[in-house]
Regions:
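Cell-envelope and extracellular/periplasmic
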Residues: 1-284
């Protein structure tokens, strides 16, 4: 069983899909991290969740890298199903987003072990009193996933909304985000095997609504701490900035170096002759 991929269902809206700017952080390249794409497990490359052409850095990559640091064997698989701008009603049992996530998870489970569900959603419900029945809707959705995926005890990690909301840009209208956070926290505290992750101290892009790339790296580390230790994370981690730097400083394997060079050549960042020269230096 140690060789089977341990998979995680990634669901929610744009801050789970990821809108962090790609150029603001070093890429995470790890041959033990795979993502489900076109029905196959592919070596992970960001953006992972391509719901929009502007998709970028999400919390999933640093979550997965932290998993690899803790578990020395095996692979982790990411099942990206987040949809930018989605309200919780769009995730209701039987709706398109819900059905798609169930379908992708079931497909992945043919050759992986579903190990957790990562959820981040609520910005689109942070206005107009939608918080009043948010808990009930979230409960129905998560119970549905656990039942349909035959995983009644699967861990669910739920992230809070950033305190930068309600101030500017696209996030200016999200004035009830604190009330949504109360519901998210209440749900995680009351339900078995559910863990809340606070977004305290995270920063946003200039648009006022999307978590920036560096903060997404931090958020992913917090999500993993919640999953691994089976506890709520109610603030920033100790030495969080340093831990992000450790992610970026990891020495790549030959396979990872080849993958990165191939990607750079395909994107036109290096010439074919440069690709061959640098590939030779890796020993491949």
């Amino acid at each position: 069983m140690k060789d089977i991929v341990k998979s995680f269902l990634i669901i929610g809206q744009s801050n789970m899909a990821g809108r962090g700017h790609l150029h603001e952080v070093k890429p995470i390249i790890n041959e033990r991290i795979v993502m489900l794409r076109n029905g196959r497990w592919q070596m992970m490359a960001e953006p992972i969740n391509c719901d929009r052409s502007v998709s970028g850095i999400s919390l999933a990559a640093s979550f997965a890298d932290a998993w690899c640091r803790e578990y020395k064997e095996g692979k982790i698989g990411l099942i990206p199903c987040a949809e930018g701008g989605s309200e919780i009603d769009e995730w209701d049992v039987g709706k398109t987003l819900y059905n798609h996530a169930v379908s992708e998870a079931r497909f992945a489970m043919k050759n992986s072990q579903l190990t957790g569900i990562l959820w981040h959603q609520g910005e689109s419900d942070s206005m107009g009193g939608k918080h009043e029945i948010y808990y009930e809707k979230l409960h129905r959705i998560m119970q549905g996933f656990r039942k349909e995926l035959d995983a009644p005890d699967i861990p669910i990690v739920i992230g809070g909304l950033g305190s930068f909301l309600g101030q500017s840009g696209f996030g200016k209208n999200c004035t009830e985000y604190m009330l949504i956070n109360q519901k998210l926290k209440q749900f995680a505290f009351e339900q078995d095997n559910c863990y809340f992750v606070d977004a305290a101290g995270l920063a946003c892009n200039p648009d006022g609504i999307h978590i920036n790339a560096v903060s997404q790296r931090k958020f992913g580390l917090r999500y993993f701490e919640a999953f691994f230790h089976k506890q709520h994370i109610l603030g920033p981690l100790t030495n969080e900035d340093e831990r992000v730097l450790v992610l970026e400083a990891r020495t790549h394997t030959k396979t990872e170096k080849t993958f990165l060079l191939s990607m750079q050549m395909a994107l036109g960042d290096i010439s074919y002759s440069d690709f061959k020269a640098q590939l030779a230096q890796t020993g491949e």
